[in-house]
Design a protein with these regions (language model features):
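Ferredoxin-like iron-sulfur electron-transfer modules
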Residues: 58, 88, 119, 270-283, ...
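A short, conserved structural fragment
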Residues: 101-112, 334-335, 883
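Short, amphipathic alpha-helical interaction segments positioned at domain boundaries
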Residues: 115-154
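Flanking helices and flexible, charged tails adjoining ferredoxin-like Fe-S electron-transfer domains
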Residues: 331-384, 399, 445-447, 451-481, ...
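Beta1-alpha1 glycine-rich phosphate/pyrophosphate-binding loop at the start
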Residues: 393-396, 402-403, 444-448, 484-552, ...
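Glycine-rich dinucleotide-binding loop and its adjacent helix/turn
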Residues: 454-475, 534-554, 578-632, 737-753
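FAD-site-proximal beta/loop scaffold in flavoenzymes
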Residues: 587-610, 694-767
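A conserved FAD-binding loop/helix module that cradles the flavin
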Residues: 763-788
Length: 923
C-alpha cells in the first residue's frame, strides 16, 4: 500500500532496523487503516512496508487490536459500553484497557456530566504516535515507534499542507505566542494567551517527556536537550499522563518555571489544535531542530500549519544588529541586513514565496530547513564590525548600550560571545576596527577602548558580571564529566561556555597558573596579570574546576581520565614551543626563542639582560620580545625581519610603540649564521631577502647569499614561529596530525578522528590571536555538549556563524556625528618606556559618550513576514525594544475540530485554485 513519497525514510541512516520478518497480522493492518489520516492507506490494504502497520505491530497485540477495532477514532466509550461492544467481562477488559493506555494506544478523559471515565482511540498525530514515544523503555525496546511517529507527521500531510488555511484547519499543533510579547496588544483574543488556558484548567497540570526530543534522539538526530518535562498536559490529559506513567503532576508555579526556562532557551510554545477553541490538552515547548509539529510548516514552507495571529516587526531606529533575534528565530524569519541606505536608496529584501497562488510541490520545500533557518544574514551584508570579529560579537549593540549608560547590560552582551572582554580590551588585534565603516570617513570607532571601559566592572569582585546558566534541561546540572586540556584562551573559553550550559568542566593546566599565552606570552605592560585573574575567577564562580600543575600525558593519561568517567576532551594546549632558525651557530649561549623569553619574564620580571639584543622576526610577538628585552636591561635592541616595512606582520601601532621606546628595525634581511666566542653569541650575520613567496603563494623566502651584514650582539631572540609540544598527550589515541604537527579536525565541529577528542585554538589553526582562540572555544563547547548528549547530531541545525559585510563603497551616509576618535591617556606615574606596569588608562565616561556617538549604526535585523510564525521568541532576546509582535493575521487564531478540517480546507483550496489559474493567465 505504500505509495511513492517525495521524502522517503532513509532506513540506512537509522541506528536500528524496522522489523518486517514476523507473519503478517491482518488485525493490525485493519487497525492502522482505520486510524490513519493518509488517504491512499484508507483506500487500500496496508502492507508490512506501511508505517501504520509496522508502527502498531511493534507494540500492539492482537487482543488489543480486537478491542480497538470495536471503537471509533476520537469517540469516547465508557467501560460498560466497551464491555457490550467487545463481549469481554469488565474484570478482564479493564486491565487490558489500562495496558492499552500505558503503551499509548488509548487515552481517556472524564468529559461527561457524570465525570465517568471514558476511553478514546486517538488519531495518530497528535495522539498515539506521541504517546508511544513518551516512554523511554518502550523506545529502547521498540525503537521503530520513533520512525513511525516521524512518518505519521509527514506522509498524511505532504499533499495537503499548501491547502491548509490560516488557523491550521484542526491539524496538529499551533504556535501560541510568548505572553509578554502580546500583553500590550488590546485586540488579542483569549485563546491567544497561555494564561487563558492555564486558568481554564486551573490546578490540573502534569509535566511529561517530549516525544519529539526522545524519538528524534533515538533516530540519531537528537538536539542535545534533556527531553523530560517540557510537555505540559492540562485537564484530563494531566491525569492520563500520571496514571499511565508518562508524567507527573506539577503546580501552577512549576508550570510557569517550565515556560520561563523554555523561553530562556528559545523554545517555541505550541498548543494542541484539534478540538476547536474551547479545548486543548497540551502545551509544548518545542525545539525546531526536532519538533515534528514545527516541521510541518518549516519543511513544506507552509507557515499556516504553525503560525499564530502575530507577525514580528522591527523598528530600525532601535535595532543595533546584535543578532540575538536572528540566532533564536526558529523559522529563520529574521536575518541581519543593513540600516544604512545605499546610494540608490534602501535595500529591498526578498520574501519567502507562499503557496497562496502558486502550485506547490517538493521543489518548493526546504528539506534542509534546520540548517537553512540558521542563516544569519542576507547576501547584501550587515555591520562590518560583527562580520569581521572572529567571535562575531554584537559590537553595534554594546556601543549603543554604552551610549545609554547601560554598562552592565553591555558587558552581559559582550559575554554572550567573549568571556574575556577585559583581556581583549587590552590585547585584541581589533579586526572590527579595521572593518569599521567609520574608517572610510575619518577614523574607525575606538571599539576596543570602549570594550575595555565596559569590562572594568569585571576587575572588581563586587561588580563583575557572572552570567546566568541557561540549560536545555529541567533536571539540574548535567552529570557528564568533561576534561579540558590546556588553560589558555581556547580552553578557558570552552570551559566558560560549557559552564553557562550547565556543565561543571575540569580544566587541566600544566603551568602553575591558568591563562596560557595570555599569562605567559603577553607582557604585563600590555596585559596585567590581575586582569587575567579577575576574569578567570568568574569561571570558578560558574563551577569550572581548574587544576594547575597537571600535565596530561605525563601525570595522568587520557585513558585514565576516561576510566575516571570523563566523556569528552577538549585539547587546547597552544603552540608553546618556539621555532629555531636552522642556521649555523644557533646553539650558542645567549640565543633563545621569544616564547621562552616571554614565558620566563612572565613568571619573573626581575630577569636581567645585558649588552645588545637582536630580535629575529617581524610580528607582534617579536615586538613584545624587543620591548621586554629593553625592560630587562638590554643596552639596545634591533629587530630584523624578512618583510619590507609596509608588509611587516606586526600592527602599525605595535611598531610605533616599539620604535618610540628605542627599538631599531632592519627590514628585508634574514639570519645566515650566528657567530660566537667561547660558546656565547657575539654577532648575527644577515643575508638579503629577495622574495617571500613561491609561485603557488606559499611562504618560501629566497636570498642573495652575497649581500650580507653583521650585527654585533650579546643576546638573540628568535621570533620566527611557534610549534606544538605534544609530549605524550596523544599516545595511544587516534588523533591525526597534519601540517605543522597540528591536530586534524572537522572544520565545523572541531572533532578529531578520535570521536571523544575535540581540539581548538593554536593546536588546530596554528598561531593566531586570542580572539580566534576564544571563538574556537565556544564552538568546541557547542560540539561537546552535542557529543555527550545521547544520539545528538553535531551539525544539524547548527549556526555556521557565516556573516557578510555590507558594501561600504555603496553607502549614502547622510548626517553623522563629526567628533574625532577618542584616545585614552597614559598614567603619568608609570614610565611607559621601561616599566613592566601597564601605563594605558581607560577612556573616561565622557569620552565613551563621544566615541559611541561616532558609530554609524550600519546594521539592522530584517523580518520576512512570510516566514514568521508569530512565536515571540525574538522579543524575549531583544534588549533594545526593537522587535515586537503585531496582530496582523487574526484569522490564524481560528481553531476548529479535527473532524471539521475539510470544512475549513475545501473553501480555502477552491479560492487558492482560482488564484493559481488567474496567476497563470496573467503570465
Amino acid at each position: 500500500m505504500s505509495k511513492p513519497t517525495a521524502f522517503p525514510l532513509d532506513e540506512s541512516r537509522l541506528p536500528f532496523e524496522i522489523p518486517r520478518d514476523e507473519p503478517y497480522r491482518e488485525k493490525i493492518a485493519r487497525l492502522g487503516q482505520m486510524i490513519t489520516d493518509r488517504i491512499p492507506a484508507k483506500k487500500g490494504i496496508l502492507t508490512k512496508d506501511d508505517p501504520e502497520y509496522w508502527g502498531l505491530a511493534s507494540i500492539v497485540t492482537d487482543e488489543m487490536a480486537d478491542v480497538a477495532l470495536k471503537m471509533k477514532v476520537r469517540k469516547p466509550m465508557t467501560l460498560p459500553e466497551l464491555v457490550k461492544a467487545t463481549g469481554k467481562p469488565a474484570g478482564e477488559l479493564e486491565p487490558l484497557l489500562q495496558q492499552m493506555a500505558v503503551v499509548g494506544l488509548l487515552e481517556y478523559n472524564w468529559e461527561n456530566p457524570r465525570r465517568e471515565k471514558q476511553y478514546i482511540l486517538p488519531m495518530f498525530v497528535p495522539g498515539s504516535a506521541e504517546f508511544f514515544n513518551m516512554n523511554k523503555q518502550q523506545i529502547a525496546d521498540h525503537p521503530e515507534v520513533t520512525a513511525f511517529f516521524e512518518r505519521m507527521t509527514f506522509l498524511p500531510l505532504e499533499h495537503i499542507t499548501a491547502m491548509v488555511p490560516p488557523g491550521g484547519a484542526g491539524i496538529g499543533m499551533h504556535v501560541i505566542p510568548v505572553e509578554k510579547a502580546i500583553e500590550t496588544e488590546n485586540r488579542s483574543a483569549d485563546i491567544e494567551h497561555i494564561s487563558h488556558w492555564l486558568k481554564k484548567y486551573d490546578g490540573k497540570y502534569a509535566a511529561g517527556p517530549c516525544s519529539c526530543r526522545m524519538s528524534r534522539a533515538a533516530m540519531g538526530e537528537g538536539c542535545g536537550d534533556d527531553p523530560d518535562d517540557w510537555c505540559i498536559g492540562v485537564g484530563d490529559m494531566a491525569d492520563y499522563l500520571v496514571e499511565t506513567n508518562k508524567g507527573h503532576y506539577v503546580t501552577y508555579d512549576e508550570v510557569m518555571q517550565i515556560l520561563q526556562k523554555a523561553e530562556d532557551n528559545g523554545f517555541v510554545h505550541q498548543i494542541t489544535n484539534i478540538d476547536g477553541e474551547n479545548k486543548i490538552f497540551a502545551i509544548c515547548n518545542c525545539n525546531v531542530n526536532v519538533c515534528n509539529a514545527l516541521r510541518t510548516s518549516q519543511l513544506f514552507n507552509t507557515p499556516n500549519m504553525s503560525r499564530s495571529a502575530y507577525v514580528a516587526r522591527v523598528k530600525p531606529e532601535n535595532c543595533v544588529a546584535c543578532g540575538r533575534c536572528v540566532e533564536y528565530c526558529p523559522a529563520g524569519a529574521v536575518k541581519l541586513g543593513q540600516k544604512l541606505c545605499t546610494k540608490d536608496g534602501p535595500i529591498t529584501y526578498p520574501k519567502q514565496e507562499l503557496p497562496d497562488a502558486v502550485k506547490w510541490g517538493p521543489d518548493k520545500w526546504a528539506i534542509d530547513y534546520r540548517d537553512r533557518n540558521r542563516i544569519n544574514c542576507y547576501d547584501t551584508g550587515t555591520a562590518p564590525c560583527k562580520t569581521a570579529c572572529p567571535a562575531h560579537i554584537a559590537v553595534q549593540g554594546y556601543l549603543k548600550m554604552a551610549a545609554q549608560g547601560r554598562y552592565r547590560d553591555a558587558l552581559a552582551l559582550i559575554k554572550k560571545e567573549n568571556p574575556f572582554p577585559a583581556v581583549c580590551g587590552r590585547v585584541c588585534n581589533r579586526r572590527c576596527e579595521d572593518a569599521c565603516t567609520r574608517g572610510t570617513v575619518d577614523q574607525a570607532v575606538a571599539i576596543d577602548a570602549v570594550k575595555k571601559f565596559i569590562a572594568e566592572q569585571d576587575l572588581n569582585a563586587a561588580h563583575r558580571y557572572v552570567p546566568d546558566v541557561v540549560q536545555p534541561s529541567l533536571q539540574g546540572p548535567w552529570p557528564q564529566k568533561i576534561a579540558i586540556i590546556g588553560g589558555g584562551p581556547a580552553g578557558l573559553s570552552c570551559a566558560y561556555f560549557l559552564a553557562v550550559q550547565g556543565y561543571k568542566p575540569t580544566v587541566f593546566e600544566k603551568n602553575e597558573r591558568p591563562g596560557g599565552m595570555l599569562r605567559y606570552g603577553i607582557p604585563s605592560f600590555k596585559l596585567e596579570k590581575n586582569v587575567i585573574d579577575a576574569e578567570i575567577d568568574i569561571l570558578r564562580e560558574l563551577g569550572v574546576d581548574i587544576r594547575c600543575g597537571v600535565e596530561v600525558g605525563k601525570d595522568v593519561t587520557l585513558a585514565e581520565l576516561r576510566r575516571q568517567g570523563y566523556r569528552a576532551f577538549y585539547i587546547a594546549i597552544g603552540c608553546q614551543g618556539g621555532r629555531r632558525a636552522g642556521v649555523p651557530g644557533e646553539d650558542a649561549a645567549g640565543i633563545e626563542t621569544a616564547v621562552h623569553l616571554l614565558r620566563t619574564v612572565g613568571g619573573d620580571e626581575s630577569r636581567k639582560m645585558t649588552g645588545k639584543t637582536v630580535v629575529i622576526g617581524g610580528g607582534n610577538v617579536a615586538i613584545d620580545a624587543a620591548r621586554v628585552s629593553l625592560r630587562c636591561g638590554s643596552d639596545g635592541v634591533t629587530m630584523v625581519c624578512l618583510e619590507p616595512r609596509d608588509k611587516m606582520p606586526a600592527s602599525p601601532e605595535e611598531i610605533a610603540e616599539a620604535e618610540e621606546e628605542g627599538t631599531k628595525i632592519t627590514c628585508g634581511y634574514g639570519p645566515k649564521e650566528f657567530l660566537s666566542e667561547n660558546g656565547h653569541v657575539t654577532a648575527v650575520v644577515l643575508k638579503k631577502c629577495t622574495g617571500l613567496y613561491n609561485a603557488e603563494g606559499r611562504f618560501a623566502p629566497t636570498y642573495d647569499e652575497n649581500d650580507t651584514i653583521a650585527l654585533p650582539c650579546d643576546n638573540v631572540v628568535l621570533s620566527i614561529g611557534q610549534c606544538i609540544e605534544w609530549g605524550d598527550l596523544l599516545n595511544g589515541e587516534a588523533v591525526q596530525l597534519g601540517r605543522g604537527q597540528g591536530a586534524v579536525a572537522d572544520a565545523l565541529t572541531y572533532q578529531t578522528a578520535q570521536p571523544d577528542i575535540f581540539v581548538g585554538g593554536d593546536v588546530c589553526t596554528g598561531p593566531r590571536f586570542a580572539i580566534d582562540a576564544i571563538a574556537a572555544g565556544k564552538q568546541g563547547a557547542i560540539s561537546i555538549h552535542r557529543f555527550v548528549q545521547p544520539n545528538t547530531s553535531l551539525t544539524i541545525g547548527r549556526n555556521r556563524r557565516d556573516f557578510h559585510e555590507l558594501d561600504k563603497s555603496n553607502l549614502a551616509l547622510g548626517e553623522y556625528d563629526r567628533a574625532p576618535r577618542q584616545s585614552a591617556a597614559l598614567d603619568a606615574g608609570i614610565d611607559a618606556h621601561r616599566s613592566f606596569r601597564d601605563a594605558h588608562l581607560t577612556l573616561t565616561e565622557d569620552q565613551v559618550k563621544i566615541e559611541t556617538a561616532r558609530c554609524l549604526g550600519c546594521g539592522a535585523s530584517v523580518v520576512d513576514p512570510n516566514k514568521c510564525i508569530g512565536c515571540g521568541v525574538c522579543t524575549t532576546k531583544c534588549e533594545f525594544d526593537a522587535i515586537r509582535l503585531h496582530r496582523d493575521l487574526p484569522e490564524c487564531s481560528k481553531m476548529v475540530r479535527s473532524e471539521d478540517k475539510f470544512k475549513a480546507i475545501l473553501p480555502y483550496m477552491a479560492k487558492r485554485e482560482i488564484k493559481i489559474r488567474f496567476a497563470k493567465k496573467e503570465k
